[in-house]
Curated annotation (Swiss-Prot):
Keywords: ATP-binding, Cell inner membrane, Cell membrane, Membrane, Nucleotide-binding, Repeat, Sugar transport, Translocase, Transport. This is Ribose import ATP-binding protein RbsA. It comes from Chromobacterium violaceum (strain ATCC 12472 / DSM 30191 / JCM 1249 / CCUG 213 / NBRC 12614 / NCIMB 9131 / NCTC 9757 / MK). The keyword Ribosomal protein does not apply. Residues 3-239, 249-493 form the ABC transporter domain.
Amino acid sequence: MQVTMRGISKAFGPVKVLENVEFTLRGGEIHALMGENGAGKSTLMKILSGVHRADAGEILLDGRKAELRSTEAAEAAGIAIIHQELNLIPQLSVMENLFLGREPSRFGIIDYAAMRREARAQLEALGAGGIDPDAEAGSLSIGQQQMVEIAKALALNARVLIMDEPTAALTEREIDRLFELMAQLRENGAAIVYVSHRMEEIFRVCDRISVLRDGCFVGEREIARTDFDEVVRMMVGREIGDRYPKREAAPGEVRLKVENLADENMIAGIGFEVRAGEVLGIAGLMGSGRSDILKTLFGAKRRTAGRVELDGKELKVAAPGDAIAAGLGFVPEDRKSKGLVLGMSLRENATLVHLDQYARLGVVSAAEEKRAVDGLIAQLRIRARDAELDVKSLSGGNQQKVVFAKWLANPPKVLLLDEPTRGVDVGGKAEIYHIVNQLAAAGTAIVMVSSELPEVLALSNRILVLHEGRQAGIFDAAGCSQETLMAAATGGAVHSETRKQA
């Protein structure tokens, strides 16, 4: 199927999101759609998939004008979307989510046995056969939920498949399997739109690329005839300097010391030190316990063994409030459910952790809050009209900056980062890297989990690798490679010269 979108414009109230955008998609190709957060990528794809209606413009499918007034109309036309934000019903089983609204039946009664068989087949085709079709969707990890979302879209046998950040929560193996499936779909004539901030993936799997900036179409390129620098210039309209800015200051004294850390069900025997001004990266496959270390240190999971010291004194944390009071901060993996209160304003979210700083006689001063938050908005380049804007209306990258803003108002001694750049565009990533370096230069000890190995290697001084909840080693980032980290993460042998003990 060939898709042509002409003159597409869309506004939400007074805010213009898209203006006269052009986009074409051919059958048998994987077409990347890129742009900074807030550029309009997701809105354009929601128009194509029937979630939103354009204010102006037209959509042609194989040369014929199409009226895609709903997701049902889009699906009937052969268009399916995998949303950036997970869209499963937590209380339903995996198989019920996969076949919601189109359940197989016999004699008017849902055929659960057939549904289970088909669900298992769809998951196995994705290399996700370990997911139980009867499990509640809400009980799955974020990565597993993402695989279910992908299986749900593939089950529709769509001729046009829109993938909005599909790999954000996947392991390297799952990503490889997804790319194999995408190649098969392309060979079968499917048209795929691939929305991602991961430049390496774009150049690995896509044929063409279109770029949006500030709601406008900037241009289109053949992947084979462009490069990273040109795409970045098209996206941001400027040079962003070094992709991974360097940090010059040497680490100071030991700030955080962890010995024999264990939680209730995932990690055991974890030990490391982090110095003031140092970034300790944590790498490993999904489900290896990376996030569990951070949650246990922050009091979001119960510690069952081990000792933790902060500045040489034992740290006892029973709940997140204890961790915050001691000087720990946490940027969680899932910003929407764990890092932000979506019904509150940018100002209220940014000051939530340290409200006492803005209170007089027990009453919070909104004016004091606003003065502080206006400074943070400028410092972090948060794209928002003002501090009173609902945080739920911001793009993903700007929401992530608000999560950082909570801790920048009163920088912690130790900052725990769980996938800090997930769903953030290349310009936003550079800004977050700068924030991390600023905090480290000011003496904050940083522990960072990331699934992007180039990011871990570039930002970290040392890297702790996990394998199935156990420590596989600690490596000097300067003398390490992605292959070494993956070998350790999968339980393989590694060269001893890059390995260090905690």
